[in-house]
Amino acid sequence: RTVQPVERPILSAFAVRVGDADAAFQRAKELGAWEIPVRARAMELNIPAIHGVGESLIYFVDRYDEFSIYDVDFHATPTVDPHPPAIEGLHFFGIVQYVGPDRTADWVEFYSQIFGFKPLPDAVRFGIMPKGLLLENAYRNFYLQLIEPDGIARFGPAEEDLQRIGFGTPDVLATVALLEKRGIEFLTSEKVHSSDRGALTKSSLGSVMFELVHDDPRPAVARK
């Protein structure tokens, strides 16, 4: 099985930081994950990866302290500031994944066995899009939200994919205001609008969306 290119912009991969990428990769394969064939050429980084949902990939990265993997294969555009001002408190929070009807249990098993994610109680909710099941990683600082189609959508063609990235921020409305000044547009409707709990951007390039969730940055503490 190989990953096929698509015409519309999508979330095609994400990476997890590990102490030993090869060891994590081998363990994932032993647990049943499907590996991605090595395609790195001479002088290119070989980053081990497994198949994720749909056509997406999940990479294992163990080089991130001294330099970024992007420093090896990419050069910054000369006219662009390589270190733009950061928005205070903005951090990665999680990923929203769409799954097929009655497929939530399968993905819970996948993420639990290979990455140590655990389901959260239904009463635990973040942001303004509360559907689906939340999974929490072992360090309690990254989340996956699995959403099945509901209503009549359950009977239509169901695509499984990574739908959007969530960013945590201690002040959602202040972050929305700063991002709007940078040209980011947010949804404003009767059902979906920015609040102190969260916000959702309008789709960009046809299909790419981002979500803001109220969350204070905190140190990673492993689950006991």
Q: How would you name each of these model-derived features?
A:
Residues 1-37, 44, 49-121, 128-224:
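Glyoxalase I/VOC metalloenzyme domain signal
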